[in-house]
From Swiss-Prot:
It catalyses: trimethylamine + 2 Fe(III)-[cytochrome c] + H2O = trimethylamine N-oxide + 2 Fe(II)-[cytochrome c] + 3 H(+). Although torA is induced by both TMAO and DMSO, only TMAO is used as a natural substrate. It comes from Shewanella massilia. Reduces trimethylamine-N-oxide (TMAO) into trimethylamine; an anaerobic reaction coupled to energy-yielding reactions. PANTHER family: TRIMETHYLAMINE-N-OXIDE REDUCTASE, TRIMETHYLAMINE-N-OXIDE REDUCTASE 1. One of its GO terms (cellular component) is outer membrane-bounded periplasmic space. Residues 1-31 form the signal peptide. It is found in: Periplasm. The keyword Oxidoreductase applies. It comes from the Bacteria. This is Trimethylamine-N-oxide reductase.
Length: 829
């Protein structure tokens, strides 16, 4: 694999001058800004760093950044993120909310009828709504804690701006955790002493040098490493290319344990071990049983570095519950034959073994268990802390495993109030409710205010939420069960959303404020989150389209409405803030890394920190566990957690446990009615819902104008479905349309629809207005129309999107127009 291979498919469109459209920047805007159209400017995104050039006043050419040797073809969709019909052009207010305010008919929310207003009007309505909620309900009535992937950039962080500005008005309900790793980041501190999921992992060079076996467990790094939290470097692909060669030469054995054939498995040409969805824990327990019964485990490591093995063994061997977790017990559940399980156990202890866990495996009911059990297996093997051995929970994310430069990164715009600042409504009275709730339980809170739940050893009392604020995140993408969300939104008095595009979250809002894209403002960011290769100047390409504003400008204006503009900005503008953040970073790196003055940096577009040193995760702990203990209560790896055991939870006990799911395919509960497991993993052609709006790029993968649904040949034949057919996928929670792709990569009983597909509900008559109805058909193919909205367990209370069964059929009715991408029905009054 080389750079040329990665550039195929990019070259044909990235270097071609593109024509204009009705949403293009006027020529005089560029002239007024003094922008040189012959100059290549540098910027970055979650999809990587790149350069842009303008022609006739618009973004015309996009090419990869010089240092990105493995750019993703997603940069072909960048221009469509700026120029597309989904852009929020002006401040807009839902029709009935404009007429009646907090007494509006909330059942009309989602009918997509909006009225254009001025910025002054919109921000005044925003403040008035906050005043009303704080006066009537106090801070428990407002939830502004939901966050998402936002856009890259340290200054224009939508989360920071929203929370700082709203915090100047008053307090509000916050969240804990996230949707990506909610179960993992909660359970692993009890087991390994840190969240692990966002921790730097053992360096790829050490893995390639020392590993004999790599187990990719529900992990697809080749797909997921295309994007990153900051501007991605894509250096991991160089290591994947080396790994591919070592697999070919027989020097490293890679086993992909997954219900489907992943892009990584196909790229590496490695072994595939199919496992039935949601049954990984049974396979892991059977491996443990084999290791115990054949004495294959490292007893010395267990005794010296872990706690609780003695409590765990009786469960595995069946002396505790009468069920021995043998390979024969696991085989009919997980679908892996007993002799294969035994061979796998021998392989794992034969040489140096590195587990690489994916995140999707913990986004299911009891999602804490596979992460905990995987850590137990790694402990039994005894190689935690050795180069090329042990366990990782993040080698598919943001260049984890690429040696870090170790340089200080630039700070960000502050999300909290400055010292001695107080909000206008300075109340901390949450009326007996909790001020923080698990991130994935906010719909529960709206529907059941006052209810008490267990969460991570504490009691959480749901607040009575009346108003929501979203900025730079799209919960109508990442939360589960659209129709349940509609029912909850009927109870809200006001919803405010700040976004670039008319996402479904905007559609179900009352006040919508137009933010500009990353490419219409200046910013700075780290180049590579974990590699930390340098600092990138994110230079404005064009002026903001229509009446959109940067996040900084939107909330500066809002702060002015509050009478707190100078407090908010610290009396600095955009470029002053960028220079301040840069200079603070320069001071932190003094004597370690050379950084030019800000003007030179901005002209160059980039500061390079250089390569980093290789590193082994948990090596210090292994070398001396007394001096370098883990962050667990005992300082050791906790196979059995006394703390969790004391919680007394029936769905997360003191050691890893197999528990049946509410619904499970391949003979599990609910499979008689809905026999198909829906896999709604991260997409390969966008970041969550970001870039779905890019029309020309979307058309390169859409099927018959819909999101693809990947189907096994067996299931397709049984239902008379062929490639390109429009398919209705459904269960008792909802229904959607998608375009069929029949593929041998998917075994019987499994379909895949990538999350991030824009929700586009239509009524029974196919109308956009009818999309407000509970039960409406999603016209484009959002899988979270169908997913189950329950917590993983009483411990994490995280999302369980992967616990989802469906059925599907060839769609026979009149095919409705997709309602996801064309924006609202604009009403004049």
């Amino acid at each position: 694999m080389n750079r040329r291979d990665f550039l195929k498919g990019i070259a044909s469109s990235s270097f071609v001058v593109l024509g204009g459209s009705s949403v293009l920047t006027p020529l005089n805007a560029l002239a007024k800004a003094g922008i040189n159209e012959d100059e290549w400017l540098t910027t970055g995104s979650h999809f990587g760093a790149f350069k842009m050039k303008r022609k006739n006043g618009v973004i015309a050419e996009v090419k990869p950044f010089d240092l990105d040797k493995y750019p993703t073809d997603m940069i072909n969709g960048i221009r469509g993120m700026v120029y597309n019909p989904s852009r929020v052009r002006y401040p807009m207010v839902r029709l009935d909310f404009l007429l009646k305010g907090h007494k509006s008919n909330t059942h009309q929310r989602g009918d997509f009828r909006f009225v254009r207003v001025t910025w002054d009007k919109a921000l005044t309505l925003f403040k008035h709504s906050l005043d009303e909620v704080q006066t009537q309900y106090g801070p428990s009535g407002l939830h502004a804690g939901q966050t998402g992937w936002r856009a890259t950039g340290q200054l224009h962080s939508s989360t920071s701006h929203m929370q700082r500005a709203v915090g100047m008005h008053g307090n509000y309900v916050k969240k804990i955790g996230d949707y990506s790793t909610g179960a993992g980041q909660t359970i692993l501190p009890y087991v390994l002493g840190s969240t692990e999921v966002y921790a730097q992992g053992t360096s790829w060079p050490l893995i390639l040098e020392h590993s004999d076996t790599i187990v990719l467990w529900s992990n697809d790094p080749y797909k997921n490493l295309q994007v990153g939290w900051n501007a991605e470097t894509h250096e991991s692909f160089a290591y994947l290319a080396q790994l591919k060669e070592k697999v070919k030469q027989g020097k490293i054995r890679v086993i992909s344990i997954d219900p489907v054939v992943t892009k990584t498995q196909a790229y590496l040409g490695c072994e595939q071990l199919y496992v039935n969805p949601q049954t990984d824990v049974t396979l892991m327990l059977a491996i443990a049983h084999e290791m115990i019964s054949k004495k294959l485990y490292d007893d010395k490591f267990i005794q010296g570095y872990s706690l609780g093995f003695e409590e765990f063994v009786p469960y595995v061997m069946g002396t505790k519950d009468g069920v021995a977790k043998t390979p024969e017990w696991a085989a009919p559940i997980c679908g892996v034959e007993a002799h294969v399980i035994r061979d796998l156990a021998k392989t794992l202890v034969k040489g140096r073994t590195q587990f690489m866990m994916g995140w999707c495996i913990q986004r299911q009911q009891h999602g804490e268990q596979p992460y905990w059990m995987a850590a137990v297996l790694a402990t039994m093997i005894g190689q935690i802390g050795l180069p090329g051995g042990g366990i990782s929970y993040g080698h598919h994310y943001s260049s984890i495993g690429v040696p870090s430069s170790g340089a200080a990164a630039p700070g960000a715009f502050p999300r909290n109030l400055d010292e001695n600042q107080k909000p206008l409504f300075d109340s901390s009275d949450f009326k007996g409710a909790s001020s923080t709730i698990p991130v994935a339980r906010w719909i529960d809170a709206i529907l059941e205010p006052g209810k008490t739940i267990d969460a991570n050893g504490s009691k959480v009392v749901y607040p009575d939420i009346k108003m929501m604020i979203f900025s730079g995140n799209n919960p109508w993408n990442h939360h589960q069960d659209r129709n349940r969300m509609k029912q909850a939104f009927h109870k809200l008095e006001c919803v405010v959303t700040v976004d670039v595009n008319w996402t479904a979250t905007c559609r179900f809002s009352d006040i919508v404020l137009p933010a500009c894209t990353t490419y219409e403002r200046n910013d700075i960011d780290v180049y590579g989150a974990y590699a930390n290769r340098g600092i990138l100047a994110m230079q404005k390409m064009v002026e903001p389209l229509f009446d959109s504003l940067s996040d900084f400008e939107i909330f500066t204006r809002f702060a002015a409405v509050l009478g707190k503009e100078k407090e908010y900005t610290r009396n600095m503008g955009e470029m002053e803030w960028l220079e301040t953040l840069y200079n603070e970073c320069k001071a932190a790196n003094a004597g370690k890394f050379e950084m030019p003055d800000f003007a030179t940096f901005w002209k160059q577009g980039y500061v390079h920190f250089g390569d980093g040193e290789v590193w082994t995760r948990h090596a210090d702990f292994r070398n001396d566990p007394e001096i370098n203990p883990l962050g667990t209560p005992s300082g050791l790896i906790e196979i059995f957690s006394r703390k969790i055991d004391q919680f007394g939870y029936d769905d997360c006990k003191g050691h890893p446990t197999w528990m049946e799911k509410t619904e499970r395919s391949h003979g599990g509960p609910g499979s008689d009615k809905h026999p198909i497991w829906l896999q709604s993993c991260h997409p390969d052609k966008r970041l969550h819902s970001q870039m779905c709006e890019s029309r020309e790029y979307r058309e390169t993968y859409a099927v018959n104008g819909r999101e693809p649904v990947y189907i096994s040949p067996v299931d397709a034949k049984a239902r008379g479905i062929k490639d390109g057919d429009i398919v209705r996928v459904f269960n008792d929670r909802g229904q959607l349309l998608a375009g069929a792709v029949v593929s041998d990569n998917f075994p019987k009983g499994i379909v895949r629809i990538h999350e991030g597909a824009w929700y586009g509900p239509v009524g029974k008559d196919g109308s956009t207005e009818g999309g407000a109805e509970v039960g409406a058909l999603c016209s484009y193919g959002d899988p979270n129309t169908l997913t189950l909205d329950i917590g993983t367990s009483k411990l994490a209370q995280a999302c369980s999107a992967y616990t989802c069964l469906v059925e599907f059929e060839k769609y026979q009715g009149k095919v409705p127009k997709v309602s996801s991408f064309d924006g609202p029905i604009e009403v004049e009054i």
